[in-house]
Amino acid sequence: MAVVTTKQLLESGVYFGHATRKWNPKMKPYIFTSRNGIHIINLKKTSEEIEKAYQELLNIITSGGKALFLGTKKQIQSSIREEAQRSQQYYVDHRWLGGTLTNFKTILKRIELLHLLHKQEEEGLWKKLPKKEVVKLKRKRDKLEKFLGGIKDMKNLPQAIFIFDPEKESIAVAEARKLGIKVFGIVDTNCDPDLVDYIIPANDDAIRGVKLIIWLMANACVQGNGGVAEKAETFDAKNPLKPQNYNTLNKRPYQDSPRKPSYQNQNQR
């Protein structure tokens, strides 16, 4: 049984690419057609690539590996955090700190400091300090929690990294590739698919579509850990469908309803 249906992809608006003038020629195999100066992504290809990514991530987790979810755009931060927590994986939902992977020993020292600050507060040690000093310590703890909270339990490097926007997170991509960590990523028509090992061609500005893909990758991790993947009904309940509201991240100038009969026949052409 397919992990995602064409109907789900259609309703989530993942098939809208960028303006044709902004396209990356390497994305040609994943483009179905163009309309009104906008590339339309081939949903059959998207479905196939999601299936490949899902199975590979499932295999990695089943083999005892761990994944890191990365997405720092404000609109999807909560989804990255919640789905990573649901699937018991690591995440970064704010700015990527250079060297998080390639200089992991230094990052571990910062993580140790974060744990120490939490421990000191829990044990009541801060109550003995001047108020001004406590304010400084809280500020330091909160900053560390903001950037390292999602990886504070990460004692070793992950075996996979799922990236919402590989072009924006180019430093993380470079670090992962240097270390041989498998890179999974959502790639729009203006992006370079060579940046990732497992490409998911999709509209990276369709909030519901992006959340759908993050949810699917989290399901792969849940299943890899021996759990039961959530059903589509659960995703729909958490992310109610809002027709004609798929492009609110960067507000692309689409003027037609995403669900047109001509696109529903993609798999038949």
From Swiss-Prot:
Write out the similarity annotation. Belongs to the universal ribosomal protein uS2 family.
Q: Which UniProt keywords apply?
A: Ribonucleoprotein, Ribosomal protein
Name under which the protein is recorded: Small ribosomal subunit protein uS2
Which source organism does the UniProt entry give?
A: Aster yellows witches'-broom phytoplasma (strain AYWB)
GO MF, one example: structural constituent of ribosome
Q: Which InterPro entries match?
A: Ribosomal_uS2, Ribosomal_uS2_bac/mit/plastid, Ribosomal_uS2_flav_dom_sf
PANTHER family reported in the protein's UniProt record = 30S RIBOSOMAL PROTEIN S2 PROKARYOTIC AND ORGANELLAR, SMALL RIBOSOMAL SUBUNIT PROTEIN US2M
Recorded hits in Pfam families, A to Z, give: Ribosomal_S2 (PF00318)
Q: Please list where the region (Disordered) is annotated.
A: 235-269
- BP-aspect Gene Ontology terms: translation
